[in-house]
């Protein structure tokens, strides 16, 4: 993906270590890029070794002097995630920011979602958060004591509060993640570890780019096509969100700028939400 050429932010996160799961593309890659720009050392993971290496090379080109660690990890494999946490600390130091980003949505209705599909979707949405959080929590707690702040941030979806019938399993799982975030926030607060999430709406991603490539009206460019989609979906800002816009919200919640915020979800949907 092409990341925007925005002015470099201050390096206020120098000396801190961040972890981003699902970091090889989209929101994860944009988040890693922003964290590096602000001076943090960043460890990222993904399941596809080729895409992960391409992401690492891209980030290295943009941040030649930064500390970057990229390793293939399936966050649903608990033992591998525990080993990865040890590897990250050895390579970069103890972690104070964890961004849980792994997990895509499933398109299915109640009628055509099998028991196996339900279990697979619930496992993906919950354990892609549980495994990394368990593995890195000891480091986060130590850094909260040492630095005065540490945080877990989870990428969630507007489906959590605004379910769609064609994504019934994903909508239900996303709603559960809202309460998981609140529960962890309460439990981890005595250790100084904050837990928050973001609710993303329609974000420019590979999914939408593939639909654009298959569009019937070949006269439309991306801006016209995606704008029409946004208007059809009744998004007030009349466009899709960009990965870097979601990344800005994630980094805000991960860094000390949000030091008195925990158990919350920030809406990043372009005004698409209709919930109270």
Locations of the language-model features?
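Residue(s) in the substrate-gating loop at a strand-loop-helix junction
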Residues: 157
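Short C-terminal tail/terminal secondary-structure segment
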Residues: 2-9, 162, 250-251, 262-276
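Conserved glycine-rich cofactor-binding loop
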Residues: 17, 24-25
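Substrate-binding pocket helix/loop in short-chain dehydrogenase/reductase
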Residues: 109-110, 114-122, 231
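Short, small/polar-rich loop/turn modules that mediate ligand/substrate recognition or access, typified
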Residues: 99, 189, 194, 261-263
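Alpha-helical segment proximal to the catalytic Tyr-Lys
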Residues: 138, 186-190, 259
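Active-site helix of classical SDR
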Residues: 133, 173, 181
């Amino acid at each position: 993906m092409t990341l925007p050429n925005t002015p470099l932010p201050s390096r206020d996160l120098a000396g801190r270590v961040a972890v981003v799961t699902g970091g090889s593309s989209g929101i994860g890659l944009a988040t890693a890029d922003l964290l590096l720009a602000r001076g943090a050392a960043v460890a990222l993971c993904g399941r596809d070794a080729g895409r992960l290496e391409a992401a690492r090379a891209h980030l290295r080109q943009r941040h030649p002097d930064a500390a970057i660690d990229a390793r293939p990890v399936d966050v649903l494999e608990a033992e591998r995630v525990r080993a990865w946490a040890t590897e990250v600390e050895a390579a970069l130091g103890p972690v104070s920011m964890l961004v849980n980003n792994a997990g895509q949505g499933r398109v299915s209705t109640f009628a055509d979602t099998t028991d196996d599909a339900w279990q697979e979707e619930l496992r993906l949405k919950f354990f892609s958060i549980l495994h990394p959080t368990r593995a890195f929590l000891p480091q986060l707690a130590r850094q909260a004591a040492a630095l005065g702040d540490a945080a877990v941030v989870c990428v969630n979806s507007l489906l959590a509060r605004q379910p769609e019938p064609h994504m019934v399993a994903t909508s239900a799982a996303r709603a559960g993640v809202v309460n998981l975030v609140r529960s962890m926030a309460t439990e981890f607060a005595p250790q100084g570890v904050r837990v928050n999430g973001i609710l993303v709406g329609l974000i420019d991603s590979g999914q939408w780019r593939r639909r654009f490539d298959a569009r019937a009206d070949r006269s439309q460019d991306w801006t016209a096509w995606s704008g029409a989609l946004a208007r059809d979906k009744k998004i007030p800002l009349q466009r899709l969100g960009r990965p870097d816009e979601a990344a800005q919200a994630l980094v805000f919640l991960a860094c000390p700028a949000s030091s008195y915020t925990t158990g919350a979800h920030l809406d990043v949907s372009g005004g698409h939400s209709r919930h109270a």
